[in-house]
Amino acid sequence: MAIALKGDFIGFSFNEHRSESLGIVRISDGSRYNEDLVPTTQDKTVQVPGGDGFYYFGSDYTQRQFSINIAFDELTEKQFRELQQVFGTKELGKLIFDERPYKYYMVKSSKPQLKYICFGKDGERIYKGEGTLTFTAYYPFAKSIFKFLNEYGNKNKDEWKEASGMKPEKGTYDIVSNNGSISVYNAGDLETDFILKFSLPIDNTPIGDIKITLSKENVGKEEAFLDLNGFSKKGADTGFQINTKTNLIEGFNAEGLTGTLYNENIIQGDFFKIPPREEGYQINVTGATPIEIVYDYIYY
């Protein structure tokens, strides 16, 4: 016997299409629910030459799948066609569950299956039945929709706000101070990359050496750093950004990234990430003043 989920577990959205507007509802078959706590992993191993067993070199997360059981009671022909259009797309879309509306997965819909009976009602064809929607997240983690609780207007906020790890409001976080320091906080489950943006002089005046560090407030020890030689702009660049996901220093202008790279100006140090769920971290910059820092919270 299928049981419709109650309360905040009843809905989800895909590609900004709400489940209730599509005429469907999530259901249970009456047994316990299954959920993967973490994405699928793939071990990196090499067989021991001439011996037993394998050498283990760690694991990589690969992908994550979601299967959603649904039911529909009075689905019209128009809604049936809309289901085909929404879940038949080959493009990636945002999947958001109502019980955790602070994060989204980028997923692809695949093999939606429906079982139904069809009958007439008031001169219109009506569908009643059940089905399964399957989604694959090739990037296996979720990202934050917003970063601070006051940006959410969900009625069930009290149920998930603590689990989200988010701060009530932005306050002084992510703002460049006069001395070049930026207070950062990562509410996610995993360390997160960031993009740090700088402007370049309009003329060809070179900028001086730049040092970027990660440390905790009121603690002198640097946990990570990246040092750059002074350099001048290239071509039509109006700025550059340090991207710790791609490990690139990229030029940009008003039209976007220009394809110019400045990695040859790295003297020493490494690209680094922001640790999760730890208070007091700040990114300090000397030699230049950033104009913006951009990062997401990454969740399982």
Predicted segments, located by residue:
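Charged, amphipathic alpha-helical segments and their flanking helix caps
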Residues: 84-91, 147-156
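Oligomerization/assembly interface segments of phage tail-like spikes and tubes
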Residues: 49-75, 125-141, 279
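Polar/acidic, low-complexity leader/linker segments enriched in S/T/G and N/D
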Residues: 1-45
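Short, acidic/charged, Gly/Pro-enriched secondary-structure junctions
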Residues: 71-115, 280
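Intrinsically disordered, low-complexity segments enriched in serine, threonine, and glycine
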Residues: 150-300
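A short, compositionally biased
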Residues: 4-9, 87-92, 206-207
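Short amphipathic beta-strand/extended segments with alternating polar/hydrophobic composition
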Residues: 6, 18-28, 104-111, 221-231, ...
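Short beta-strand and beta-hairpin "edge-sheet" elements
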Residues: 96-146
